[in-house]
Amino acid sequence: MSKAEIEKEPLNLSQLDLFEEIEKLKKELNAVVLAHYYQEPDIQDVADVLGDSLQLAREAQKTDAEVIVFAGVHFMAETAKILNPNKQVLLPDLEAGCSLADSCPPNLFRHFKAQHPDAIVISYINCSAEIKALSDIICTSSNAMHLVEQIPKEQKIIFAPDKNLGGYLMKKIGREMILWQGSCHVHEIFSEKKLIGLKVRYPGAEVLAHPECESVVLRHADFIGSTKAMLDYSVASDKKEFIVVTESGLIHEMQKRSPKKLFVPAPSTQETCACNECPHMRLNTLEKLYLCMKNRTPEITMSEDLRLAALKPIERMLELSK
């Protein structure tokens, strides 16, 4: 069945029906649903594993399921396929890309890398399989600092593709790196002025921010960390109010873990409140999740040569971050 035919397929299923059908398909296919914190709440609730990029990569590596359904964006599903060549990996919507991954075209990065032949390449996991294949080590926002700190000080490092995460690491660790100038549109659009206004409105609130944000925003944060780190911090903190400076999907799990606490999404520079939602992540819906499992498509595929080349830096990451 083609993508167009699948999209036209009539669905007369309620939300509850979809939940039930997805659970049935999990058993029939021996499938596991992995979902990122930035997915819509319904998908988060039906997922077998909910996590950030590092958690989901680890789960993809160890799962016994025959089919991996990845509710996230394309590079995440690619990573699952790289780690599981003999398993079917499904993505609810193949158009669910990533502005950060798109900001680092392989042909341009290959030329950039050639200009610094004595540097090793550490690439943020938010990149294509082709960029992973050009890298020495992959990192996530959870383990980036730990991995960079393990590299000898005299060794030059190219850090790609996120300039904001790279700049944050340089400041925290105190070493220079050669940065590729890529960025995430969602994390770059948060408004410093509006954030200051929220801090005035909620004077007792702690500001939790993702390191993909710009430095002018990060300087107002009480805590900076990965999505999982922000979630864990909000659970452990004695504070009752938080301003959350990342994709607003994370707030769903924060609220579930701490129902008596208040979580306020940070505002963007745009007037619409939807700007702190990743448009790529939100292409996946509960209906598309059901249909991709029912029809076992769209499926992630790649050449074995590319998979093996991209596997090495991912395995290096998993080895160094144990």
Swiss-Prot record:
The chemistry this enzyme catalyses reads: iminosuccinate + dihydroxyacetone phosphate = quinolinate + phosphate + 2 H2O + H(+)
Q: What cofactor does this chain's UniProt record say it requires? A: [4Fe-4S] cluster
Pfam families noted in UniProt: NadA (PF02445)
One term under GO cellular component:
cytosol
Q: Which SUPFAM superfamilies match?
A: NadA-like (SSF142754)
Keyword Endoplasmic reticulum among record annotations: no
Domain of life of the organism encoding this protein: Bacteria
Where is this protein chiefly located? cytoplasm
Residues annotated to bind iminosuccinate: H36, S53, Y124, I125, N126, S141, H210, P211, E212, T227
Cofactor: how and how many bound: Binds 1 [4Fe-4S] cluster per subunit.
Q: Which Gene3D superfamilies match?
A: NadA-like
Which keywords fit this entry according to its UniProt record?
4Fe-4S, Cytoplasm, Iron, Iron-sulfur, Metal-binding, Pyridine nucleotide biosynthesis, Transferase
Provide one Gene Ontology biological process annotation: 'de novo' NAD biosynthetic process from L-aspartate
Q: Report the locations given in the UniProt record.
A: Cytoplasm
As for family, the record states:
Belongs to the quinolinate synthase family. Type 2 subfamily.
Q: Which HAMAP family match?
A: NadA_type2
Note the PANTHER family from the entry. QUINOLINATE SYNTHASE, CHLOROPLASTIC, QUINOLINATE SYNTHETASE A
Q: What is this protein called?
A: Quinolinate synthase
Annotated source species: Chloroherpeton thalassium (strain ATCC 35110 / GB-78)
Give the gene that encodes this protein. nadA
